[in-house]
């Protein structure tokens, strides 16, 4: 370069006004204005990608101008992966495109060529070393490779020039990027207007320095910011030359331009979640991520205590610790990351975020690459990862065991590089918009049999999460107008987990059942074991009280916690139960009292999920003791006057038969044991016999009442004693010691529930129901939703043959029994209320506003059958008319004609009746309306229908037994079920859904 500069300088000195390109003596070359070939105009994308080819062309142009250096280096084959870094900067060995030169003086005949490669490092260097005036190459030196190899080391800020990142002083910034706004490359138009013509076209600019000064070199700014030249290294002419725009014919940009456009990456926050024993990184919603980013970028007085609620307030994020913790239930804390860079391998289904520190390093290197426009770079990190940045869109990561060799192949042929991605796509469908902070309605959902809720063995928390997501989507499709108007926000669903109250693992029941379980169809047997255990536990006196108390305490705890975190909540509360959970809720709601009673001093007090039993005991003991004292007084009076045989017969006016009873050796005790047949054999007449039988019946009933009262009194005393010792005894139940295990278990169980005789509420038939002490809820539920409920079956087993039409839940207005037609656990309730009405369950509409295809096919087939029937009747009518005409023609009997006319009229009436019924079916939907039977199905749901059946899927209709078990667990992801709940909830707010928008 030094030789080129010297030659160029000599040429300029010898012929200041003549250009070497047009110094030929040929007459046909006559130009008024000389043209100067440009070595490289504004760099086009093609020229940036092929620096070696551009440098070759530049060399040819310089050779044509007589500026060829005596020491020309021959390009050699370079390696992408075997270059050795000469500096700590990973971009130091990457080849650069040659820099352009532009004429600044009108008297220059030839322009010196700038250095072929301008080193752009972040190491310790000054501005003088960044822009040397001349660069000389040693003979045989190989050009730098386009792709260098470097070990990652963070750049030192102290080594940067003070004005790094900004254009040199005195030169205004240009507002465009040369790599984006240059339409034509230097090859397409290699000429620019000479300085003389530019000076004439721009008279407003200052004059150029005189030719006697040193040659002015103005380089086109390489990609990235250039440090300013020291003032001492600049000539006075250079310090005075301002920037001037290019003329109209200039295709390239102005000499000094801005760096390439770098846009900071938009971060998004993620959290780690374990799904089916795999850790998945799930994105926060857009709203939660923006809130986290805002708090992250703000200044907090106490950053360690910053807690932000996410996921609608169900989780808290501790920003300093990067942890996400649940609010309403027990769950392991999970990690939170501020993510900007991601990777995905062959076996990964989604992009996985890098750590925040590693992402910051990648972002710094990406910024350098964009600023300097240097790509095809390989970054090696101390942990062994190797990342290659080919271009902004193609970035790959090689594992430590699969580092590619110089040919680009990996040692392990099966391992492919990971795809590296910067930022997230704005149009990513899996990122939700976020939940509104306002809650319209609160629903507590109680799980059913077993600790899992579906065939994927997921917990109630995960299933309720799916149900909540489905409800949010339906709000956007079926209540969009109300959502846009601000009338509808969202419904919050909170799970209620009670299975831990059983303590089956501690008592050894689960272990014993495992020993006797057959090894075949293991998953199905595991599911049935959990199912049978819960049903048997709930019907047992040992665990029924524990299950009921657990559900009541958990619901009150969740309600209190929700109200404390949402003090402005003005909505109502509903409850929903699945399977056995619906039966538990039904028993609890059936034994509730009015809120005025539940808020009395005797109600159950809840503080942080612990029941304060003192007031409850006082009320229970006072009420029950009063009742028992009254009964005992009556019984004591009867005991004071014991009846004898003589007294009894005198009271019944049957003393005349005393001899008969004495003859048979009958006393008062044996009299009470006599039956009607015994009295008949003794010769007692019918009248006296009836009197004695009635007396015996009444006396036996009184004795039974006395016995029941005594047992109830003893049970009450034991129950109050057990409540005083409930906390320590429960711990003993949960962890029985090996010593005298049987005796301790008996002691703890006896003190807690059933060491005394358990009272059953018995009926004429059935097993009866265990008497349980119920406490009051802290709220009045608005609606009770039963999903796949066995309430009807268990009530029938208990002995409840019929539910009174006037019966309603004391504190709950609505009740909906929702079930799938193939659910083996679900049962109806309306036949128990109105057995005389043959009503089909209400068919739940499809969430897309139509019936399923196979149901429509059934309707069309039934319609076809009715059409065939009508056709048959019409043909019969025509045949009858033909016979009538034949009879008229062959007989004159008026009586026969009247009979034929009667038959014809009857056929006509039946036909008209069928037409009317067909019209009604077309006008009204197939499903039964609530209004048609308002008040006829009892007051359990306020006079409205109770049973609602979902539409089965077409594939389920092929084999009902195959999908029976799945249908019992389908409610958590059912759009039809969620839409029915939303409709009924917002119906209480006088908000109706519009047509579905799909």
From Swiss-Prot:
SMART domains xref list: DDHD (SM01127), SAM (SM00454)
The family this protein is said to belong to: Belongs to the PA-PLA1 family.
The record's region (Disordered) falls at: 50-246, 720-742
Segments forming domain SAM: 640-703
Q: Where is the composition biased (Basic and acidic residues)?
A: 722-732
Q: How does it sit in the membrane?
A: Peripheral membrane protein
Q: Where is the composition biased (Acidic residues)?
A: 54-63
> Segment Interaction with SEC23A: which positions?
1-363
One Gene Ontology CC term in the entry: perinuclear endoplasmic reticulum
Where composition is biased (Polar residues), the residues are 65-78, 94-108, 143-158, 232-241
Q: What is this protein called?
A: SEC23-interacting protein
Give the record's subunit note.
Interacts with SEC23A.
Where does the record place it?
Cytoplasmic vesicle, COPII-coated vesicle membrane; Endoplasmic reticulum
Extent of Low complexity compositional bias:
79-88
Record key words, sorted? Cytoplasmic vesicle, Endoplasmic reticulum, Membrane, Phosphoprotein
Q: Name one GO molecular function term.
A: metal ion binding
- Per the annotation, which location comes first and is thus the protein's main one? membrane
